[in-house]
Amino acid sequence: MYADAPSDSAPPEAVLPMDEAAMRAVDRATAALRRGEAVAIETADGSVGAAVSVESVAIDAVQRLVQLTGAAPVLAVTRRRATVLKLMGEGTGVVALSLPRCLTADEAHALADPEHRPDGDMPDGLTATAMDPGSRETAAVDLARLARLLPAAIVAPATDHTGSAAEWAAEHDLLLVRARDIADYRVHVVRTLRRVAEARVPLSGAENTSIAAFRPIDGGPEHLAIIVGNPVAGEPVLARLHSECFTGDLLAGLRCDCGQQLRGAIAEIARHGSGVLLYLAQEGRGIGLVNKLRAYRIQDRGFDTVDANEILGFEADERVYLPAAEMLRQLGFTAVRLMTNNPEKLRQLARCGIEVVERVPHIFPANGHNEGYLRTKAERSGHMF
């Protein structure tokens, strides 16, 4: 039993409630970043500044930020990316990179882009400063993460205003979002998950199956519950948490074991008679399909799957399982027999109030293309094969 499994993250109940307007502001800000627009970010002390994502930044964006704020911008990257660039030691959080002169868009791209080699030339005078969790720089990187972009942003404080953050943002026609709302967003969105549709969908080998779709209030990606048979609410249910994998699930790609795990889990649940598979919108261990393809390209240079994520600036695994716990509760289950090899799933579910009464191993043979991937999961991520 794993009820007391540790976790480094705060429990969901430790986060103060967020109103719908704040959630909408974060959602709109992620969309603006994806379009290459600047957004205004307000920190807890009431100060404000502007940020734009590195991935979608235009050549003239740095100069526009200078004109908007009256300050020289910095490049905000994750500590993982700064470590890859040999600018800081191992750690977590966000780092601000700055120059004695104004950083250029090309320099920002070179420092944040996954194709930039760790041993490449650094601009003269480049300095790296670790930022506080509540900083504008940290919020900007978190916002880029939410937008499924590279976790890097060009950020500058506003030095040309004396009014409120809202007044400054309105004056410059920028969307305004608070740093604390960005930090808490993922927890709050989970609380708004609602079952929006359900239908009977007979599957090959599991004809008595229905699929329920859960959608958050921000209109974000839906998570699916594939319910096989008639599991009894209130009793421990045979369950599998499966993060979507376009290449493995749909295309039968051989670089991972996801397709085997998906189809194998449904077959095992059908043999058992009943259970639920949660199909979670967390492509690429939470970094999104585009970034997963970037990670594959990096792996082709000889790096493993963990190194590839870190070269991109991500953690080895960016997934959270709050949505899974919420879906299980809404389906009537607070205890599971969990089909997994991943100890982090056990820890996170327990942290979210779901009792794991048994771990059911879920192992499939290597195919010749994914041997290194499976070995890395065991040796570096602690998977139990």
UniProtKB/Swiss-Prot annotation:
Active site: residue positions: D317 (proton acceptor), R319 (nucleophile)
GO molecular function: 3,4-dihydroxy-2-butanone-4-phosphate synthase activity; GTP binding; GTP cyclohydrolase II activity; zinc ion binding
Known cofactor(s): Zn(2+)
Annotated segments matching region DHBP synthase-like: 1-189
Associated pathway: Cofactor biosynthesis; riboflavin biosynthesis; 5-amino-6-(D-ribitylamino)uracil from GTP: step 1/4
EC class (word): hydrolase
Record's catalysed reaction(s): GTP + 4 H2O = 2,5-diamino-6-hydroxy-4-(5-phosphoribosylamino)-pyrimidine + formate + 2 phosphate + 3 H(+)
Cellular component GO terms held in the UniProt record: cytosol
Record-listed E.C. numbers: 3.5.4.25
Cofactor comment text: Binds 1 zinc ion per subunit.
GO biological process, one term: riboflavin biosynthetic process
Highest taxon above the source species: Bacteria
Family statement drawn from the similarity comment of this UniProt entry: In the N-terminal section; belongs to the DHBP synthase family. In the C-terminal section; belongs to the GTP cyclohydrolase II family.
NCBIfam families documented for this protein: PRK00393.1, ribA
Task of the protein: Catalyzes the conversion of GTP to 2,5-diamino-6-ribosylamino-4(3H)-pyrimidinone 5'-phosphate (DARP), formate and pyrophosphate.
Name this protein carries in UniProt: GTP cyclohydrolase-2
Originating organism: Azospirillum brasilense
